[in-house]
Amino acid sequence: MSQALPLITRQGDRIAIVRGLRTPFARQATVFHGVPAVDLGKMVVGEMLARSDIPADVIEQLVFGQVVQMPEAPNIAREIVLGTGMSVHTDAYSVSRACATSFQAVANVAESLMAGTIRAGIAGGADSSSVLPIGVSKTLARTLVDANKARTLSQKLKLFSRLRPRDLLPVPPAVAEYSTGLRMGDTAEQMAKSWGITREQQDALAHRSHQLAAKAWEEGKLSAEVMTAYAPPFREPLEQDNNIRKNSTLADYQKLRPAFDRKHGTVTAANSTPLTDGAAAVILMTESRAKELGLTPLGYLRSYAFTAIDVWQDMLLGPAWSTPLALERAGLTLADLTLIDMHEAFAAQTLANLQCLASERFAREVLGRSQATGEVDESKFNVLGGSIAYGHPFAATGARMITQTLHELRRRGGGFGLVTACAAGGLGAAMIVEAE
């Protein structure tokens, strides 16, 4: 094992995560229908600052992300600063790393803390699958640009006369990889076939996810980290995630047909994460700054790793690649972890990554490592359920996982936790967090 790389500032401070909060996550076109991601981001950051009693001018930087970009607000981070009463002098910029976007936001703020350019910052992400950038055809787009440059009415009419009815149809956002044309579900089907994952195994994991998430809510474990949200017309509050099946039964999953490979597939809407709206954020500080303000951190960022692999085959193996690297940088092994939280984009993807982590052959032949990362202990794995149950607002999931894991570590008396996710483009992310 190579030498661990401690995440500390120039003054020797650890990177503290002092607060974390999220909105409830809502299925597409339900409670947050019509609420753009920027407003969800303002909602969660404003509430988090109000709850924390941290003066607004203490926050020197805000790094935020969204995956489904809205052209009218390309820098969501700056709009959140301007819309939440924070100091106008707060530095703010936006990031995007597909489903690992808020992992990237956290890493960026941590790097600013380590460089000494700031002492406190906010990281997070928001996405709306209900407010989408509906585009136009390439032909219509080109015609509109040319018409804007035309000098006479006759020139404009001539340009528009070339359009056909099909050119006027709206173009929804692409759901496939730009480079391959494959949908995420197609990749999940690939992985199920590559790793011999059955429909029964996928349905069982999805059922477990919903059961554990429902239990977590029932026992009140999530109430401190999820705000009550109101959406227009502001009559009914949303207090909990509305995707969780509180009375999940395994038989219900077996009724659904495959969603991607209709004839031979095993990936269904029930064993996949749904399109979701929501936002999540965390406040990071140097350890000494937290002490100055009298704040007790939720925990500390011990290490992180980002990886990238080919997109043509099994591209959602990011956790299997990034986890050993994050563990190595933290000076830990899988056995040292108290909790493991893996993003459940699809049950097939999750199960494939678990197989790879335990595989000696994968370690040797693919990763070039002498031994497997290790077999994941189910009693440590996604103990409060995962994204299949909670939902997945793309840019918000990482911040949800970090906050949720730190709270659960504290309930268990401390320890180390792994949070890890796959992402579009063959990307992977993993972070080791620590609570005392």
Swiss-Prot record:
Any one GO CC term of the record: cytosol
Classification via PROSITE patterns: THIOLASE_1, THIOLASE_2, THIOLASE_3
UniProt keyword terms in alphabetical order: Acyltransferase, Cytoplasm, Fatty acid metabolism, Lipid degradation, Lipid metabolism, Transferase
Assembly and interaction partners: Heterotetramer of two alpha chains (FadJ) and two beta chains (FadI).
Described function: Catalyzes the final step of fatty acid oxidation in which acetyl-CoA is released and the CoA ester of a fatty acid two carbons shorter is formed.
Family the UniProt entry places it in: Belongs to the thiolase-like superfamily. Thiolase family.
Protein name: 3-ketoacyl-CoA thiolase
Organism whose genome encodes this protein: Klebsiella pneumoniae (strain 342)
Gene that encodes the chain: fadI
